[in-house]
């Protein structure tokens, strides 16, 4: 928007201009609030102006014809719409220029467009008319007693403030007015010009009066500059700040207002994207134009005013009284462009500059105005009768932080929620773990209007400050009594929470080795003395209570760990892993009782029932199990005593006959130490090569008996335990042992009596061992009795088959001897059988002849090259199938197909069947059969004669020289290969080159080279070159198909 010349139409009321950054136009139009001008002058309108106004009124009444999109001039349909109103169409710029005089008054987009040239032309025409035709009017009454200076502080991010008084403010304060050259009519402008003439005459009289008066002590700077000459900007003094206005003058603005009648209104906008409509109601009073007549033109009055201003002295006087002490301190923003006009009874407005500081001893009377976030308009109404001072006190010495927003409750709630969310532990504690709440005292300061959620301390209790590293800002207010502050840093994974209560006597440290987190809780009145405590676990599962650590010393020190602490009511968690203790005999009481446990064994590893139920001596006795420590029967069964001092538990067998029951020597009682980890776990089972029973496979292997060594029965992985040599031999053949015993007794009669006694004692020992071992082995064989019966049945069937064969042979031999007439028939049958055998052999020979997998390539070409003279059918069919159906398959040649389907295809090709690969639905099966055939060729496609040449081609990397050398070497090398090998490589590389250009396959050149390089017996670099430069290498290859 352009403004008219201030020398003609007077100064502007409000020279503040704001840019519209986000296309939010907030025009503060004072439409219904400002009263109209009382034009009491008899203005004679020229006929031209009257005619123009009538034409404009008629044009506004006539609606635009927008039914058809045709040109207004030539009615053409190849048109473009007017960008201003979007309602009129033209076929080109020429017709638009022709119709523009008629259309410009009707275009609705003139108010939205910056049509500066058109407005400038209108302003020039208006100046010429006003200079030629000046009419007198009545006396003008200027209302300059109530002057208001409007400051708009925009502290928000994006504030669009357009403070413009359009079409409604007919007269300005101090002789200034804001006019719009595109919307104000000519008669109204004339009335404004006439009123300005009267104002200029008053200014001339004021200047003459001020020249006659003596200069005062205070300095004043006129805020009404001359249009032709500008005042130089004065030096910046304390308490003043210069501001650049749109008219070009540098006007200092006093931080403390000087006149008591002027009111300052500051609207502070702290919101984002707020549209502030400052409607000045009843402040800019309309001017009554009572000008009845005037003599001379505007030019003469301006010259007279200029001469009077040039002739005045440097020190001017002012009738304004001395400024009163300020009631408030106001610091305007540098973005404001406004003129403060203070009236002191004279026509010319002066701005008195006080050299006092901005602060005064009088109390600051301030009213804080906060804008709501949801409000889109902020209207500030200033009445002339009231004097309000709205400002913002920004004192840096304040201890409380006063924010510029009204979100006291909502923002505090959000901050508290964020702080609590940041303290949440997302890691170690399990779902059942109840995290205690810390007693934090939050003191809300009701005196201040800032409820920012900070943690405040009291003099009697300690508080915890939570410093969050996850972008959360906490405003902490420092108080006087800061005794104990535990700063807990809530990081992403490590959470350290220490609850320090008044009586820190004992520490209950729960160490979790699995999660590497340590819980530390300081309880108030919970004393633990672990010198003579006995813990007896009566649960059925008997899980060891690890993770407990006891401190006998009553100390107030606390350990900072990485897991939230438990409360005093929460018992320590039980864990099955190894624990730690800080005092001796923490798990074993004074009476020798210990905490039992259960070891979880691997699958298919059997364990005796006594061990399963043996986890506590009292438990065993209560359930009816005999003690395994003092009972001799248990020792005879092979369960020896446990020695706590050993590192590991030995295997439960009775190989050593000298020990009591095959166990180990040691103390029967239990020591104070715990069982080791692998104490009850059985070791691997022993086997012997003499006789091995493989229960899984169902086969029985026999070996010759060794008389010098007893047999030993070894059970497979599904068996439970291993057995001794003597008992195994006695169980397998008890009758032989009895005969051996009796034989030894009979042979002993020839000896002496001493030898007889020794033999008797030995036999007694053997019998006692036999009775104990047989009872144990019988129980074991009950478990595997079913399997033995099955194997016996297998043996029985084998023997029956053998017997039937023997009997059939014997019968055939007897029949030949008895019936001589049947020899011919028998010979014929034998001949028939021989013929059948020969036929079967011929079929096998035919199958061997049709095999193509695993034979040399030359023979395969001779056998199966029916579709192509140089390529076997399996390769040719596979390549053509993949070219049609698998060239866009993802992961072709990389993903493997079904192994069973590939095997079936291989068998069909080996039998010589004409296989139709198009019946296959899986492309990966066909690619797998192709790779299988190339892999099973005895010699690779490049043969073994060119190993050194291929190695030389590999050297060089990916440089241009190495690639060119590789291409030339590959051409020469292919020409030296057999034609079938070269032709297969030609077809294969053609397919791979086409696949490399398909993005859906996700198989590039390097991926394909990695797949086929080992199969073809070549390096990856050479294979990549063969695929990438297929045209250069194979384009010159020729083949002799006639051979």
Curated annotation (Swiss-Prot):
Bias type Acidic residues, positions: 644-671
Ranges annotated as biased composition (Low complexity): 14-44, 201-225, 254-293, 307-411, 467-532, 547-594, 726-736, 752-771, 801-821, 829-842
Residues reported to bind Zn(2+) 2: 82, 85, 103, 107
Binding, Zn(2+) 1: 71, 74, 91, 95
Single Gene Ontology BP annotation: small GTPase-mediated signal transduction
Top-level taxon of origin: Eukaryota
Chain ranges of zinc fingers (MYND-type): 71-107
Domain Rho-GAP: residue ranges: 855-1043
Region (Disordered): 1-44, 137-163, 199-532, 546-594, 614-690, 706-772, 801-842
Annotated Polar residues bias: 241-253, 453-466, 615-625
CDD domains per record: RhoGAP (cd00159)
Primary location class: cytoplasm
UniProt site positions, description: Arginine finger: 894
Subcellular location: Cytoplasm
Gene Ontology terms: cellular component: cytoplasm
UniProt xrefs under SUPFAM superfamilies: GTPase activation domain, GAP, HIT/MYND zinc finger-like
Pfam families on file: RhoGAP, zf-MYND
Protein's job: Rho GTPase-activating protein involved in the signal transduction pathway.
Descriptive protein name: Rho GTPase-activating protein gacZ
Source species of the chain: Dictyostelium discoideum (Social amoeba)
Organism classification: Eukaryota, Amoebozoa, Evosea, Eumycetozoa, Dictyostelia
């Amino acid at each position: 928007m352009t403004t008219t010349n201030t020398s003609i139409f007077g100064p502007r009321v409000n020279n503040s201009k704001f840019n519209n950054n986000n296309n939010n136009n907030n025009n503060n139009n004072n439409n219904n609030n400002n009263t109209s001008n009382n034009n009491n002058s008899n203005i004679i309108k020229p006929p031209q102006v009257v005619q123009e106004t009538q034409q404009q009124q008629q044009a506004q009444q006539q609606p635009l014809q927008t039914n058809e999109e045709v040109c207004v001039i030539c009615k053409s349909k190849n048109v473009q719409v007017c960008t201003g109103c979007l309602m009129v169409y033209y076929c080109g710029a020429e017709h638009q220029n022709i119709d523009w005089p008629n259309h410009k008054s009707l275009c609705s987009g003139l108010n939205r467009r910056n049509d500066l040239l058109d407005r400038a032309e209108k302003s020039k025409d208006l100046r010429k008319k006003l200079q030629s035709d000046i009419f007198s009017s009545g006396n003008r009454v200027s209302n300059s007693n109530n002057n208001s200076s409007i400051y708009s502080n925009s502290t928000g991010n994006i504030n669009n403030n357009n403070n413009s008084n359009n079409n409604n403010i007919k007269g300005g304060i101090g002789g200034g007015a804001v006019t719009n050259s595109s919307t104000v009519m000519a008669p109204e402008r004339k009335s404004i010009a006439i009123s300005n003439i009267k104002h200029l005459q008053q200014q001339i009289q004021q200047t003459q009066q001020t020249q006659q008066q003596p200069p005062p002590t205070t300095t004043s700077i006129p805020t009404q500059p001359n249009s032709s000459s500008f005042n130089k900007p004065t030096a910046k003094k304390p308490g003043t700040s210069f501001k650049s206005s749109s008219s070009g003058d540098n006007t200092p603005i006093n931080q403390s207002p000087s006149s008591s009648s002027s009111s300052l209104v500051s609207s502070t906008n702290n919101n984002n994207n707020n549209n502030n409509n400052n409607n000045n109601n009843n402040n800019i009073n309309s001017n009554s134009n009572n000008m009845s007549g005037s003599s001379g033109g505007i030019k003469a009055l301006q010259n007279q005013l200029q001469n009077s201003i040039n002739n005045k002295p440097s020190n001017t006087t002012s009738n304004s009284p001395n400024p009163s002490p300020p009631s408030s301190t106001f610091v305007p923003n540098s973005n404001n462009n406004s003129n403060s006009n203070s009236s002191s009874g004279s026509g010319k407005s002066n701005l008195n500059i006080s050299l006092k500081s901005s602060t005064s001893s009088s109390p600051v009377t301030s009213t804080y105005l906060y804008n709501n976030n949801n409000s889109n308009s902020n209207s500030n109404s200033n009445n002339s009768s009231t004097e309000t001072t709205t400002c913002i006190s920004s004192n840096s010495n304040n201890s409380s932080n006063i924010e510029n927003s009204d979100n006291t409750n909502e923002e505090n709630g959000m901050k508290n929620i964020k702080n609590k969310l940041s303290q949440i532990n997302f890691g170690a504690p399990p779902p059942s773990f109840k995290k205690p709440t810390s007693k934090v005292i939050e003191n809300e300061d009701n005196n201040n209007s800032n409820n920012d959620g900070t943690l405040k301390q009291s003099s009697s209790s300690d508080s915890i400050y939570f410093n969050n590293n996850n972008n959360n800002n906490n405003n902490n207010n420092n108080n006087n009594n800061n005794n104990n502050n535990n700063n807990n840093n809530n990081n992403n994974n490590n959470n350290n929470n220490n609850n320090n209560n008044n009586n820190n006597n004992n520490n209950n440290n729960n160490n979790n080795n699995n999660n590497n987190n340590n819980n530390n809780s300081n309880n108030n009145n919970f004393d633990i003395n672990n010198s003579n405590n006995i813990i007896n676990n009566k649960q059925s599962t008997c899980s060891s209570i690890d993770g407990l650590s006891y401190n006998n010393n009553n100390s107030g020190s606390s350990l900072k760990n990485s897991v939230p602490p438990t409360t005093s009511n929460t018992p320590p968690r039980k864990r099955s892993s190894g624990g730690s203790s800080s005092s001796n005999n923490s798990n074993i009481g004074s009476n020798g009782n210990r905490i039992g446990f259960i070891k979880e064994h691997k699958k298919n590893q059997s364990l005796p029932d006594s061990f399963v139920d043996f986890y506590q001596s009292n438990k065993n006795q209560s359930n009816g199990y005999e003690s395994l420590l003092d009972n001799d029967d248990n020792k005879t069964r092979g369960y020896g005593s446990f020695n706590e001092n050993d590192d590991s538990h030995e295997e439960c067998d009775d190989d050593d006959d000298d020990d009591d029951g095959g166990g180990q020597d040691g103390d029967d009682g239990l020591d104070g130490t715990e069982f080791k980890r692998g104490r009850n776990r059985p070791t691997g089972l022993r086997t012997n090569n003499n006789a091995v029973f493989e229960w899984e496979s169902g086969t029985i292997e026999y070996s010759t008996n060794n008389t010098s060594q007893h047999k030993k029965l070894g059970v497979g992985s599904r068996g439970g335990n291993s057995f001794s040599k003597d008992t195994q031999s006695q169980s397998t053949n008890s009758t032989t042992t009895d005969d051996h015993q009796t034989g030894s007794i009979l042979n002993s009669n020839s000896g002496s009596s001493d030898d007889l006694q020794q033999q008797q004692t030995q036999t007694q020992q053997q019998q006692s061992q036999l009775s104990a071992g047989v009872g144990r082995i019988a129980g074991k064989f009950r478990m595997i009795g079913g399997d033995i019966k099955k194997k016996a049945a297998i043996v029985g069937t084998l023997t029956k088959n053998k017997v039937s064969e023997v009997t059939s042979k014997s019968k055939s031999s007897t029949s030949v001897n008895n019936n001589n007439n049947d020899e011919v028939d028998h010979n014929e049958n034998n001949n028939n059988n021989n013929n059948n055998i020969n036929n079967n052999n011929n079929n096998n020979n035919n199958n061997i002849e049709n095999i193509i997998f695993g034979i040399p390539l030359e023979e395969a070409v001779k056998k199966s090259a029916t579709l192509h003279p140089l390529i076997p059918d399996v390769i040719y069919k596979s390549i053509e199938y993949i070219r049609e159906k698998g060239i866009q398959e993802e992961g072709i040649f990389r993903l493997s197909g079904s192994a069973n389907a590939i095997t079936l295809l291989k068998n069909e090709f080996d039998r010589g069947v004409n296989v139709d690969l198009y019946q296959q639905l899986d492309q990966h099966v066909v690619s797998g059969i192709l790779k299988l055939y190339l892999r099973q060729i005895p010699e690779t496609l490049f043969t073994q004669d060119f190993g050194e040449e291929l190695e030389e081609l590999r050297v060089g990397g990916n440089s241009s020289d190495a690639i060119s050398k590789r291409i030339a070497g590959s051409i020469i090398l292919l020409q030296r290969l057999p034609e079938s090998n070269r032709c297969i490589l030609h077809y294969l590389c053609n397919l791979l080159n086409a696949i490399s250009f398909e993005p859906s396959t996700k198989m590039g050149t390097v991926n394909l080279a990695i797949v086929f390089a080992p199969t073809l017996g070549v390096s990856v670099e050479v294979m990549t070159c063969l695929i990438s430069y297929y045209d250069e290498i194979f384009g010159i290859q020729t083949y002799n198909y006639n051979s």
